[in-house]
Amino acid sequence: MNNNNLMETFYLETPSLERKNEIIDYINEFVEHKSDINGTGSLDKILDGYTFEQALESCLNMQYEEYAKKFGRCQGKTFLLIRKNDNKIIGTINVRWNLTEKMKQFGGNIGYGIRPTERRKGYNKMNLYLGLIEAKKIGLDKVMLDCDVENLGSSKTMEALGGKLERTEIDPYDGILTSVYWINVDESLEKYKDDYVNFIDKNYEMIKRKWK
């Protein structure tokens, strides 16, 4: 996504023990930069005293309805955004379904983030496009996302992928003025395919054709 001679390519990967140290470093980077952590699912539980193995288990199990309900959560899958060129974790994205009533109002189907040292390079748009591919696999026709109204970078990311602003209101759970967007999954995957398909790793599970 940068203007250099070597084209960068990306893919989403399920968190694993093999990436333990890298994931811990990724989360710690947010702490060091005093930045909010988004899109990590349960992985950031390591900041609350959980072992990495416990956090990973929770993260991977959240896709199962029975497990999610036990904790009053919605089902979700978390992915690492990997830049293939240097095998580095650039960001994370969490795709959710069977939303709780709370998440239907604020939070929505997708949460994402890019590590502080890799921001302002357009990576979150790639992250969201790949997230929409995963949303389609799950069977979501449209997805809801939100962000603080002051987070102009996130708003621009959502709008760049076809996000339509539905409402702006105060989230009663944190008291922050929040913008809520909706994205039509099939429509956006097709409309913006030419902008992103060449940056997706060729081995990633992606069909380069019209979305149907």
Give the location of each predicted region:
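GNAT-family acyltransferases
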Residues: 2-109, 178-212
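Charged catalytic carboxylate motif
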Residues: 22, 127, 153
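A short, internal acetyl-CoA/4′-phosphopantetheine-binding micro-motif in the GNAT/acyltransferase core
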Residues: 82, 97, 109-120, 148
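Conserved G/P- and acidic residue-centered "switch" motifs that form tight phosphate/ATP-binding loops
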Residues: 87, 122, 139, 151
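Conserved catalytic-core motifs of GNAT/GCN5-like acyltransferases
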Residues: 146-147, 162-179
